[in-house]
Amino acid sequence: FDFNNISDIFEETTWENALDLACDGFNNIKSKLGPNALAGFGCAKGSNEEAYLFQKLIRTGFNTNNVDHCTRLCHASSVVALLEMIGSGAVSNQVADVTEAEVIIIIGSNPTVNHPVAATFIKNAAKEGKTLIVMDPKQVEISRHANHFLQFKPDTDVALLNAIMKSIIDQDLVDENFIKNRTKDFKKLKEHLKDYTPENMSKICGISTEKINEIAKIYATASASIIFWGMGVSQHIHGTDNARALISLSLMTGQIGRPGTGLHPLRGQNNVQGASDAGLI
């Protein structure tokens, strides 16, 4: 393509000319500076097919793995923890499962604003008598519908969640059968949590010992408990540890793998999960 023939103003041209211009420009960069001088940043609001084709273009056309999309900032920390602990970097169930839950926990998320459809499911479930527990450093809108609102101090997610797990252990509320048959290294977790008593962590996270013990019992003894979390948990210096704590909480009580239970990281855009699964990362 003759770059000298490019006009200073917009003018109509053919698809062939436009594509030649784009391709030659990329090829010039690749030949002069190498393939890693190029990168592609995709979109999580496209389809799975679009995500697959885009990453294929970058990897096979540009010959580089410099491809990414918003999940790197979004739930990358959650995906790491989920892959590490349950072998799947995806939600375990759909939002509509709140209709079968007895207890719903939302932490680090403002679904009324960011996930209005999901928020409607959750609000309707609360109106029908499901127990809604909201944990957040700020008073998000959905907390108005909550039976329990834990406004903990910023950056103390792990302290609060570890205290809840420690309380569950101390109250003998763990699911021994689930732990024996479907998990490993519970003894290591138990040892790790020995100093994270509700009394000690209450001073750090700002939630009373009594409330921590109450929430622990409500979550662990429910017939079905489900956890939702958002950017407040994942876009954090301790994001992976935050997610690990939530996953451990679910596993130690057997609150996963049944209708109305599970782990659901609320994605930042409508097809983050699909784009990630299609290789756009």
Regions found by a protein language model. Give the residues of each.
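Cofactor-pocket helix-loop regions in the catalytic cores of large enzyme subunits
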Residues: 1-271, 275
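Short, intrinsically disordered, charge-balanced linker/junction segments flanking boundaries
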Residues: 276-281
